[in-house]
A protein has these predicted regions:
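GH16 jelly-roll
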Residues: 1-117
């Protein structure tokens, strides 16, 4: 899940992996909101099964990635995962900061919950 500071009305779900030749592949979708996601707390979830990865906001699924049987070289998604929460500045996804960039920025997290079956 990713958001862009200059676009707080859209949340992105993207899978990133390498194809059989080692080239970067990405596949994703997004969910737009009439109000800024930054205006209040939301429940974000990523649920993985042996066949799919689902992205949800406030209980509503907005993207699903198929990883069944390692389709399209997605077998890496069957292995262990880790959670990374961060605020990044710059890069290819959002571009470099400029005079309109607001600093400082913050990410408020109420809780993180992990469970398995």
């Amino acid at each position: 899940m990713e958001m862009q500071g200059q676009n707080p009305f859209t949340n992105f779900a993207t899978m990133h992996w390498a194809d059989v030749n080692g080239n970067h592949v990405s596949f994703g979708g997004n969910l737009s909101s009439p109000t800024s996601y930054a205006s209040g707390f939301h429940t974000y979830a990523v649920e993985r099964t042996s066949t799919s990865i689902d992205w949800l906001i406030d209980g509503v699924q907005y993207f699903q990635g198929n990883i069944a049987n390692g389709i399209n070289n997605t077998s890496a998604f069957q292995g262990p995962f880790f959670i990374l929460l961060n605020v990044a500045v710059g890069g290819n996804f959002v571009g470099s900061p400029d005079s309109s960039t607001v600093f400082p920025q913050e990410m408020l997290v109420d809780y993180v919950r992990v469970w398995g079956n």
